[in-house]
Amino acid sequence: MFYDFVPQSRFLLGTAGYPSPQILQQAVMASESEIITVSLRREGSQGGAFRELLTQLNKRILPNTAGCHTVKEAVTTAHMARELFNTRWIKLEVIGHADTLQPDPFALVEAARILCADGFQVFPYTTEDLILGEKLLEAGCELLMPWGAPIGSGQGLRNIEGLRSMRLWFKDIPLIIDAGIGAPSQAAQAMEMGFDGILLNTAVARAQDPLRMAQAFAAAVRAGYDAHGAGLIERRDMATASTPIFGMAQFS
C-alpha cells in the first residue's frame, strides 16, 4: 500500500501545534493512526525531547520537509530526517507560495527525482494536476498526496471533480488526501470517493477537544473506507421507490 507498509488505519496524523505534549499523546492514541508526521524544521529548541516523545508513541514516523521553498532545502532536510529517524520515508513538501502554501511543481518534481535516486521512499505533497502526478511517478514516487484545499484552511475538498478525475486516472496508485480537511464529514467524503488515506493535522490539533476530534476523524475515515468498499448506490436525478408494490391490497 504505502511502499513496504500496509496500515490497518487509513488515517495519518500530524504532530504540530497541539496545546501540550500530553494532549498530543492522547490525540495520537485516540486517532488509532499507525503513521504520524513530524516536521524537522519546526521542532525548535526542544527537538530532542520531542523526538523522545515520538519514540514513546511507538508509531511509524513520516518526517516531512515542511517550510522548504527550494530543492536544496528539501533535499538537505530529507537527508537530516533520514539520519535522525532512521527511515527512508519522507513526505516531500516544496512550497511555491507563502500565502497559499501551494506546492512548486517544478521544484517538487526535481526534488523527488533526486531523493528517489538517493533511495528515499517519497510521499509527495502535490495538487490534483494529472500531469504533475505523472511526472512525480516518472521521478520514482509510488504514491501521491494531493491536497484537498490549502494547508490549514479547513475547506475540505475544494475541487471535487478534479480529485475524482485524479482517482480515476491513477486507479492503481495509492492516493492520500493531504491538507485542507477541516471536518470528519469531509474526510469520509474523500474515502467514499476511493482515496486510500487521509493526512491532517490542524483539524485535530486546533480543535477545542483534540482527543475527541481525533476519535471522530478515525470513525469517519473508517466509515468512508467501508462505504466505498461496500459499493455506494448511483446518484439519480429522480426518485425511485424502495418499497415494492407487490401484495398491496386492491380497492374497488
Curated annotation (Swiss-Prot):
Q: Which GO terms describe its molecular function?
A: thiazole synthase activity
Name the reaction it catalyses: [ThiS sulfur-carrier protein]-C-terminal-Gly-aminoethanethioate + 2-iminoacetate + 1-deoxy-D-xylulose 5-phosphate = [ThiS sulfur-carrier protein]-C-terminal Gly-Gly + 2-[(2R,5Z)-2-carboxy-4-methylthiazol-5(2H)-ylidene]ethyl phosphate + 2 H2O + H(+)
Q: Which residues form the active site?
A: K91 (schiff-base intermediate with dxp)
Where is coiled-coil annotated? none
Q: Which GO terms describe its biological process?
A: thiamine diphosphate biosynthetic process
The EC number of this protein is 2.8.1.10
Pathway listed: Cofactor biosynthesis; thiamine diphosphate biosynthesis
Query: A single Pfam family, by name?
Result: ThiG
Q: What is its main location?
A: cytoplasm
Q: Where does 1-deoxy-D-xylulose 5-phosphate bind?
A: G152, A179, G180, N201, T202
Broadest EC class? transferase
Q: Keyword Transferase on this protein?
A: yes
What are the alphabetically sorted keywords of the record? Cytoplasm, Plasmid, Schiff base, Thiamine biosynthesis, Transferase
Where is it located? Cytoplasm
Q: Which GO terms describe its cellular component?
A: cytoplasm
What family is this protein classified in?
Belongs to the ThiG family.
Role noted for this protein: Catalyzes the rearrangement of 1-deoxy-D-xylulose 5-phosphate (DXP) to produce the thiazole phosphate moiety of thiamine. Sulfur is provided by the thiocarboxylate moiety of the carrier protein ThiS. In vitro, sulfur can be provided by H(2)S.
- Assembly and interaction partners: Homotetramer. Forms heterodimers with either ThiH or ThiS.
- Protein known as: Thiazole synthase
| Encoding gene, per UniProt annotation | thiG
